[in-house]
Amino acid sequence: MSKTVALKFLQMSLVTLTTDYGSRDPYAAALKGRLYTEVPDARIVDISHEVSPLHLEEAAFLLGHSFGHYPKGSIHLVAVDEGHSKEVRPLLMLKEGHWFIGPDNGVLHMIRPEIRADQLLEIDFRSEATNFPALDIYVPAAAHLLRSGAGDLLGHPTDTMIEKKIMRPTLGNEKASITGIVQHIDAYGNLISNIPGSWIKEYQGDRSLEIDLGRRQKISKLCTHYREMDDGLPLALINSMGYLEIAVKRQAGPANNGASQLLGLYLRDRIEVRFT
């Protein structure tokens, strides 16, 4: 086998799964079983099966901030709100050298929307009256790609897909503030905002910084590591994904869900950074 062919096979032999199926039901296991049946030497990676039910933004966030760490040519299957209440087109998208297979419900559009898709197809083959599109449509499409099949054989090109409005941070008057929201809460209860750290660096200059969390809660400095703050106190830092994050050191767990519970902040709640 030539080096080029071997590299292509290596790149096309990995598929990731992102679903809202959870871990107690057989749905995620069925996807894996069908994939292994179709391609016994496939490598399957679970990004998450714990996406909140029908939560497209969460699925797009998880996949959007993880797919770039996988080799180009990887296949990413996303199954969230697949269309059990109405028929939804199955799509195949090529972006940044990665294949994405999922429903046309907005989730594919929200995966790094600032990057234009290189190819977009509506998958043609369908099982009649399927109640499980991921198993009956997405998996066979992924298996075709895993066997190094051409993507354009799976369907026909389309110029459109459903787009969902994405909440973006806004810049205040005279660039004196940045207003954003909580876009994700991780397993530690850390609040990940949609405010890029690059914005703070660009607009702060030599001014002081104050982060307003509402309810008269404020943070007046940025830390560089979680260990810089005393236990139980909130801190702000720019996380590894490049976003402003609010955390509370050693306050995670079922009984105390970190910064989210301690500060009373949840998804889409407002966070404002002021410069003075």
What positions do the PLM features span?
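Active-site histidine-anchored catalytic micro-motif
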Residues: 38-43, 55-58, 71-73, 77-80, ...
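Conserved subregion of the PPM/PP2C metallophosphatase catalytic domain
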Residues: 96-108, 112-126, 151, 203, ...
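A conserved acidic, glycine/proline-rich C-terminal tail/linker
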Residues: 194-264
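Anionic-ligand-binding alpha/beta catalytic cores of soluble enzymes and soluble regulatory domains
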Residues: 129-205
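Structural motif
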Residues: 13-16, 42-45, 74-77, 90-92, ...
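N-terminal glycine-/serine-/threonine-rich phosphate-binding loop
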Residues: 7-87
